[in-house]
Every structure is written in structure tokens, then in C-alpha cells.
Regions:
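N-terminal positive-inside, membrane-proximal cytosolic segments immediately preceding the first
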Residues: 1-18
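Hydrophobic membrane-insertion alpha-helices, especially the h-region
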Residues: 17-34
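Juxtamembrane/interface segments at transmembrane-helix termini
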Residues: 33-44
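Short extracytoplasmic/periplasmic juxtamembrane "stem" segments immediately C-terminal to an N-terminal membrane anchor
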Residues: 45-64
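Electrostatic cytochrome c docking/interface patches
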Residues: 62-99, 128
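Extracytoplasmic electron-transfer domains, predominantly the class I c-type cytochrome c fold
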Residues: 88-89, 110-115, 122-186, 198
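The canonical Cys-X-X-Cys-His
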Residues: 94, 100-110, 172-176
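Post-kinase regulatory C-tail/linker adjacent to protein kinase catalytic domains
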Residues: 190-198
Length: 198
């Protein structure tokens, strides 16, 4: 009559641990697949790469109480309409270049990185580029030769010359334009775009 209750037995807890771990792993796999479907290019919150062919803005939505990306009419990057594959390759070059040049050692992207230099999440839309007509040319010149085309945005901090080629600069700009189209739940907050009316 000295029988151990089921809940107090070692085998019960071993089996419970195995089932709980297996269940948690299964839930993790399902959530991962769900997240990937929602954060892949071409989804509702992350537009397809060919969005670089469109005008992109960032406007406050009173109903949602946050700023949202607004995709408008055609506004071709560097005067060219890119196919989805060409756009993907150009954005991919820009992403790989920002990784290779360690841009996040000074900048943030989507809130990740360092806060020494400006956040790049909506850099394509930044008022510091003066006008939409001048933006592409100014960005290319700045990325290739930041010392002679300095954009300090009032901080007096200057970007070092990272020996970025013209093609890499165009890739970075495509990447930044694509990034500005991503729905970031209103981040960065209180951001005023180059298109904003005073």
C-alpha cells in the first residue's frame, strides 16, 4: 500500500517534459512559418521589390494612430522601370553592401544597430535631401564621396569614405527606397518626409 501517486513518479515527469517540449517546438515551427509569410517581400506589410518603381510617402493615419507608408504613382528610380527580378537584384546588392560596409555600426535599420548616425529606415524620405528632384543625385554623390558631399543633418558627425562604387551606391539607394515602403508600425515616430507640407 505504499504505492507512489502517478503525479509523483519520475516516469510521469519525464514523459510530461518530452510532450511539453515537443508541443512547444511544434508551436514554434508554426509561428515561425506564419511570421515568414507575413514578413517576406511581396506580403501586405513588406511590399514586393518592384515598389522601387513607385512614389513612396509616409503619412499619419488618424484611424490607426500611427504613420503608414503610402505607395503612389510611378516614380522610377534612376529614370528606369525595373522588373521584379531586376529590382530584387538591385535591392539585394544594396542590402549586401550595407552589411559588407558595416553600416549598422553607426546607423540603425528598423530600430536595430547603433545610434551614432541617423536611422536609415526612412532615409529615402528624409527632408535632408532637400527635394525629390535632387535626392537620387545627392544620395549617389554622398555615398561615393561623403567627405566632399557631407550631409551632417545638424550633428557635425561625418560619414567616412567607405569606397562605395557607383553601382553599390545605386543598390544602397534602391534598398533604402524599398525599406521606406515597409510598414514599421509607425517607426520612426514623428518622422516628417521630404513630401510633407509644412
Amino acid at each position: 500500500m505504499n504505492e507512489t501517486p502517478l503525479w509523483a513518479s519520475e516516469s510521469f515527469w519525464k514523459k510530461t517534459a518530452i510532450w511539453v517540449t515537443a508541443g512547444a517546438f511544434l508551436i514554434l515551427v508554426v509561428l515561425t512559418m506564419d511570421s515568414l509569410s507575413k514578413t517576406s517581400a511581396g506580403s501586405k506589410r513588406v511590399p514586393a521589390y518592384s515598389v522601387i518603381n513607385k512614389k513612396i510617402d509616409y503619412q499619419y493615419n488618424k484611424e490607426l494612430h500611427k504613420s503608414m507608408p503610402v505607395i503612389g504613382e510611378n516614380e522610377f528610380l534612376f529614370g528606369k522601370e525595373y522588373t521584379e527580378e531586376e529590382a530584387r537584384q538591385l535591392v539585394d546588392l544594396g542590402k549586401k553592401t550595407t552589411q559588407a560596409k558595416n553600416c549598422m555600426n553607426c546607423h540603425t535599420l528598423l530600430g536595430n544597430g547603433a545610434y551614432y548616425a541617423p536611422d536609415l529606415t526612412k532615409a529615402w524620405l528624409d527632408k535632408g535631401w532637400i527635394s525629390r528632384e535632387m535626392r537620387e543625385d545627392m544620395m549617389v554623390k554622398f555615398l561615393i564621396d561623403p567627405e566632399n558631399n557631407a550631409r551632417t543633418f545638424g550633428s557635425n558627425r561625418k560619414m567616412p569614405n567607405l569606397k562605395i562604387t557607383e553601382q553599390e551606391a545605386k543598390g544602397i539607394i534602391a534598398f533604402l527606397k524599398w525599406m521606406s515602403s515597409i510598414d514599421t508600425n509607425g517607426f520612426p515616430y514623428n518622422f516628417k518626409t521630404i513630401n510633407a507640407e509644412e
